[in-house]
């Protein structure tokens, strides 16, 4: 079996259907004995250039190990699904399991946001305690 990196863009109005599409497409790949090494749903993102007058799309990245026949079947499914705006399948030399730069950046943003949210809350609680002590005196 060979290793592939697959990226596909879904119409932004069909974002709710993406989990079902991912399940269907991973089913095609694993049915032939394939294995999913990495699956990342990047969500709605800005496009570099408009596609069919759309400026945003829902991005999905998969790194898989499967047969060439199942990849052909997947590409056919992409072609016949009108919600898939673009797709790209690249053959890779080895399995890639680490998080992509996009996912790493998102994780860093999420941790930074959560720490920023905690800091003002801690300051606010200290202020409330101080004001309670001042009024108690």
Curated annotation (Swiss-Prot):
Keyword NAD (UniProt): no
InterPro entries named in the record: Ribosomal_bS6 (IPR000529), Ribosomal_bS6_sf (IPR035980), Ribosomal_S6_plastid/chlpt (IPR020814), Transl_elong_EF1B/ribsomal_bS6 (IPR014717)
Any one biological process term the GO annotation gives: translation
GO molecular function: small ribosomal subunit rRNA binding; structural constituent of ribosome
Positions with biased composition (Basic and acidic residues): 104-137
Chain spans, region Disordered: 96-137
Pfam family, one: Ribosomal_S6
The keyword Ion transport appears for this protein: no
GO cellular component, one term: cytosolic small ribosomal subunit
Swiss-Prot/TrEMBL keywords: Ribonucleoprotein, Ribosomal protein, RNA-binding, rRNA-binding
Gene3D superfamilies attached to this UniProt entry: 3.30.70.60
Function statement: Binds together with bS18 to 16S ribosomal RNA.
Family: Belongs to the bacterial ribosomal protein bS6 family.
Protein name: Small ribosomal subunit protein bS6
